[in-house]
Each structure stands twice: as structure tokens, then as C-alpha cells.
Amino acid sequence: MNKLLLKGVAAAFCMATMFGTTACGDDDDLVNVEPPVEKTQDVILEGEITSDMTLKAADNNLLRGFVYVTDGVTLTIEPGTVIKGEKSSKGSLIVERGGKLIAEGTAEKPIVFTSDQPKASRTYGDWGGLILCGKSIVNNTAGEAQIEGGPRSYYGGKDPEDNSGIVKYVRIEFAGYPLEPNKEINGLTCGGVGRGTTIEYVQVSFCGDDSFEWFGGTVNAKHLIAYKGWDDEFD
């Protein structure tokens, strides 16, 4: 009985050793593959955006002059992306009627629009701002008007449910400047924006004109913060 037991234990030990050695040999053959690292690119936006486009958090994104998201086009911005407005050209982003901006950040990874100047040198009005133009109803005879601060874009229409996209968990900093007398670009300007649009958890700070301004429209914005604007915080 004892001899049989000892033989069984010895056999089990040998098998375990054999399989253990084989397993170790297999591990030595494994190759660890590192996940690809996304390279940083310099992305300069200028003129018209005429096809769908996505801005990535890994890139250096710059607005140069007036940048237009045209009718039928969607500009998507990843959470955590930083977009800088060029001071020398007063970079500005204008979403025209029929265009869409999908800027949906998160509480942990907000989307930030800010100045291209060094952090210690940023100030009021370094760049233009963000303008949304929709097809919702407005209170004038023509039913449409040219947007304040936008040299060519119109807003207004007959669709109260119009959708200009999503602006959520977004910060807008050091924007706002007078394009012409009584025609200023604000931090966030909404012209005829419809209730199909989502505007939530948006903070505008250190704006050179109004932090937020609305011209007609039916959008229901909520959770907005205006901090130390030069003119009106909400207009």
C-alpha cells in the first residue's frame, strides 16, 4: 500500500514538473506587443470645412481666421481635445445653417477652446469665439438675419426643431472681440439655434465681449457658467 502510494506521488510530481517546464518554455516564446501610440499632428483649420472631419485630442489644433462648417457638414471633436484660436488672425469657428458641431466632452475630459498664446500671456479677446447658426424661428420680418460677428453667415428659418449638434462639457476661454462697431464676436453666439441642439455644461471665461449671446431660436441650454466676462455675461 505504502509503495503504491509513493509511486503515485512520484508519478504525479514528474508529470507536474514536465508540464510546468513545458508551460515555462511556451511563456519564453511569447512576444509582448505594445499598443500603437497615436502620433501628434499639427492641424490648422482655415477657410471652409466642406467634408466631415474629426479633431483628435492627441493633435495640436489651431483655428486660423474665420473657419466655416458649411451646410451638410459635421465637425466632430473628441473628448479632451484642445482647440486654440490664433491671436494674429482672430481665429473663429462658425457653424453655418445646416452644418453641425459635435463637441461632446466629459466631466473628466472637457473640450477646451482657448488662446494660442503662452499660458502666462493669455488675455481677453485673444481670438474670436464659437458661433452657431441655425434654422429655427427668429423675431424679425425677414425671418433671417446676418449673424453678429460673422462676416457672411445668416441664421433663422422655420424649423424650431433644427439641430446644430452638441456642445457639452466645453470650456471657451479668452475669446471675444469687436469685428466692427456693434458687431462683436462673443464667447458663444447662438443665432436661430433650434431645440434639437444640445448645449449643456458650457463655461465661458475671460471673454472680451459677452460670454453668451442669443439671437432668436428655440434651443434649451442648461448648466452654463460665465466667468469674468468683459461685457454682459448672458445677453
Q: Where are the regions a protein language model picked out?
A:
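C-terminal motif of bacterial Sec signal peptides marking the signal peptidase cleavage site
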Residues: 19-23
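Bacterial N-terminal signal peptides that target proteins for export
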Residues: 1-10
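Repetitive helical segments and hydrophobic/amphipathic motifs
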Residues: 11-12, 16
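Beta-strand/loop edge motif enriched in small/polar residues
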Residues: 25-235
